């Protein structure tokens, strides 16, 4: 039965082929070649992607952050295919660039990359790289980048969006802040492991030893503990430190200042009310101390019972300190809160 059915099926297939239009054979041949070409192109893409990932994993095995020039940047970051996210720090670490902020940011970036490399969650979906200005000037020009350091996320597909550029000026460059930003952009959560830092412990031990030694040497005369002036000075120092934003600096880790790479101008005051530099805190601390000194002199001139001429001089000096430095402080406030209507002496 099966032997008799086979010839009949072949005859039916032959009849169907005879009824096909004559011009359909070139079309079928073209369609077959197109399918073969598409299959070959897809295989080529897969092989190219595998080679790129293998190369990136090899670099990552040697160091957590690999440096890139223009050619490597275009091949591994800009050119498809990609199935991985790339975090890139654009920086200027050469000594002649004199970018102290770049060195500080690089230390935090290294801590973050090492935390990812040695974590149990490490995989080939996220890599860390660096482009130095002196090694990839063409990359800076291609991206129209005019400041360093800058952190960018390049997603597996498509172009980077605005949120893929880390807001360093507002958030700071602490490794923990970078890890939060990366988790938001890639859904990869990195637990930051910092190397042990014993400087705080050593400083505390030295302070305790110094205080203990002082108390031991003065054990027969401890009246200085009840000195109101000494405790007032200590309290003022704490108040000046806290009102100048030192705690914000400790939490956010902002740069000390910002140097414009084009004209070399250094900014010590941040132009936004949402951020500040470390130098800005030092300036505010000095201004607050000077204003306080002026108020103390005014109080001394009003309450003391000395020579009238001397009291008048003290009063003028105190008034000058308060007016001058408070005007300076107010001008800084106006530069950060644009549109603030009040001012004293104009320093702008």
Swiss-Prot record:
Q: How does it sit in the membrane?
A: Multi-pass membrane protein
Lumenal face of the membrane: 42-196, 243-276, 334-348
Q: Tell me which Gene3D superfamilies the record gives.
A: Glutaredoxin
Metabolic or biological pathway: Protein modification; protein glycosylation
One GO MF annotation is: magnesium ion transmembrane transporter activity
Q: What intrachain disulfides are recorded?
A: 99-102
> Start and end of every Thioredoxin domain?
59-187
Query: Where does it reside?
Result: Endoplasmic reticulum membrane
- Where would you say this protein principally sits, based on its record? endoplasmic reticulum
Q: In which tissues is it expressed?
A: Expressed in most non-lymphoid cells and tissues examined, including prostate, lung, liver, colon, heart, kidney and pancreas.
Per the UniProt record, which residue ranges are transmembrane?
197-217, 222-242, 277-297, 313-333
Q: Which UniProt keywords apply?
A: Disulfide bond, Endoplasmic reticulum, Intellectual disability, Magnesium, Membrane, Signal, Transmembrane, Transmembrane helix, Transport
Domain of life, source organism: Eukaryota
Family statement drawn from the similarity comment of this UniProt entry: Belongs to the OST3/OST6 family.
Outline what the protein does: Acts as accessory component of the N-oligosaccharyl transferase (OST) complex which catalyzes the transfer of a high mannose oligosaccharide from a lipid-linked oligosaccharide donor to an asparagine residue within an Asn-X-Ser/Thr consensus motif in nascent polypeptide chains. Involved in N-glycosylation of STT3B-dependent substrates. Specifically required for the glycosylation of a subset of acceptor sites that are near cysteine residues; in this function seems to act redundantly with MAGT1.
Q: Which disease is it linked to?
A: Intellectual developmental disorder, autosomal recessive 7: A disorder characterized by significantly below average general intellectual functioning associated with impairments in adaptive behavior and manifested during the developmental period.
What quaternary arrangement does the UniProt entry report? Accessory component of the STT3B-containing form of the oligosaccharyltransferase (OST) complex. OST exists in two different complex forms which contain common core subunits RPN1, RPN2, OST48, OST4, DAD1 and TMEM258, either STT3A or STT3B as catalytic subunits, and form-specific accessory subunits. OST can form stable complexes with the Sec61 complex or with both the Sec61 and TRAP complexes. The association of TUSC3 or MAGT1 with the STT3B-containing complex seems to be mutually exclusvice.
The entry's protein name is: Dolichyl-diphosphooligosaccharide--protein glycosyltransferase subunit TUSC3
Q: Which species is this record about?
A: Homo sapiens
Lineage summary: Eukaryota, Metazoa, Chordata, Craniata, Vertebrata
